[in-house]
Amino acid sequence: MTTASTEPVSQPGDAILSVNNIEVIYDHVILVLKGVSLSVPRGGITALLGANGAGKTTTLKAISNLLHAERGEVTKGTIVFEGEEVQALSPNELVRRGCIQVMEGRHCFGHLSVEDNLLTGAFTRRDGKAAIRDDLELVYQYFPRLKVRRTSQAGYTSGGEQQMGAIGRA
């Protein structure tokens, strides 16, 4: 993956996520990322594009603090989400705060309805059924097609609809 600059595009105060000049090493010797920086403005959308093996997934794993599971580590630079260093937070805490990685695969439960797929995991929430229902309606605002297909069996929806469901579930 190449970067145009090692400096973030927006100012740190404007960004919900800042990755500043990070290096990632696996097994204490294999350098897989060097000098990667990016900044995601609050309310913005950012895409990581690159060839196979360019470091997109490794960058996402670093942001999600998931590298240790694969004997990887950030050895240089900083990753800050909502004003806090990612390395100081557990992956579960990052998810609770809204830093969620949606993988390329769709990972829907084909035998469940679209809506049941969206509600997967909601049972672990502690903020009540009304908040869950409000979040579901927000997903339907972002993805009106899912509301139309909410009673359809997820396994019979298009790939794009399944990806919308994966994003909505996150």
Predicted regions and their residues:
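ABC-type ATPase nucleotide-binding domains, specifically the catalytic core motifs of the NBD
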Residues: 27-28, 46, 67-70, 114-134, ...
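Conserved ABC ATPase "signature" region
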Residues: 8, 84, 130-149
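Conserved ABC ATPase signature
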Residues: 153-157, 161
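The feature captures the beta-strand-to-loop junction immediately N-terminal to the Walker
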Residues: 49-54
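Short beta-strand immediately N-terminal to the Walker A/P-loop
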Residues: 46-47, 101
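Short coil-to-helix segment of the ABC ATPase nucleotide-binding domain corresponding to the Q-loop/switch region
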Residues: 60, 111-121, 150-151
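ABC ATPase NBD Q-loop/coupling interface
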Residues: 66-67, 78-96, 124-128
